[in-house]
Amino acid sequence: MNIFTTFLFMIVIGAVIGAATNHLAIKMLFRPYKPYYLFGKQLPFTPGLIPKRRDEVAKQVGVLVMEHLLTPEGIQKRFESSEAKQEILHTVHRLIDKGADMEITVLSLLERFGVSHADVKADEWLHHWSDRKLASLLKKYNEQTLSELLPLEVENKISSKIPDAADYILKRGIHYFESEEGKARLGNMIDDFLKERGMLGGMVQMFLGNSSLIDRVHPEIIKFLRNAETKKFLTDLLVQEWEKVKQFSLQELDDKWNVKELAYSVKKQLLSHFSTKVILDKPVGSYVSEVAVDLKIYLAPVLVDKGIKAASNALEGLLAKLKFEDIIREQIELFPLKKMEELVISISNNELKMITFLGGFLGGLIGAIQAIFVTLF
């Protein structure tokens, strides 16, 4: 009975000591959370292992993650995988569809982003920009001739239309002088001509009479205007003048006919019929829906590919600038020790219990061996 009691006692004591030792060792991984002092001296094993080495652990985890887990090569491989491309492409398609369904106007959308009266600002910008652009162009081509400024096809087109212009002028002249107004104007011109000639004019008017003179001159003028030689003469005259005008520089044209002022007037007149409000006061979806199919088929794949390539090329530098290892280290250092302890225990609770039981088993086994030695010796 004494031997059995000794065996049982030593086995129980050994098991309790072994289990308690392992349990205490597990607890000492985290506890105590802070150092304790006695007579100004820090007590051993305070704080626990992980609290004491937390800064070093945080630093090593950060280095481990960046050098072996979150590497640029691994992220690039993930980025450039077909699955990632398809997922990004589907996301872009959803955004396009969402844009096509937007009923808010462009003006209202811009106002949401802090851009008020965008139409007025756009019109003002357009007017100022067109003024600067036109002034720059006029200055640039100031010394060039009209022949140099006009495209060859335009110059040839104008030259080919000169006979038509001469014919039109003569026809309008015939039409005018055949009218009562034209005939009356012709009579007034004859009267003025004769008055300027003094006595000689008076004598002619006395012999022929004003009506007789008009009746004689009027048919001759119409005949002159209908004559083919007159048309040829006028055509040649217009051609000669056109050749002269083509050699004028832009500055010379402006000096003679204020063409620069005319250019500004034409520009102003054209812009007066255009307002960006007509464009900006429409729903965003009306614009997106018109090009949604083309955006999905042509633009989206190209943008996704180029975006992934650009991101991959810039990834290594970006990760270096972001310093993820420092972020990981800082987060681990700020993570509450109690939460960390609960997290580790919740994950490995069964394994930690088995370690405690193993300590008890080994302690009991050692106690049994000691009991044998005590009994025998």
Swiss-Prot record:
Pfam families: DUF445
One cellular component term from this protein's GO annotations in UniProt: plasma membrane
Record keywords: Cell membrane, Membrane, Transmembrane, Transmembrane helix
Subcellular localization, as worded in the UniProt entry: Cell membrane
Chain ranges passing through the membrane: 1-21, 357-377
Topological relation to the membrane, as annotated: Multi-pass membrane protein
Primary localisation category: membrane
Entry's family note: Belongs to the UPF0754 family.
Name of this chain's protein: UPF0754 membrane protein BPUM_0927
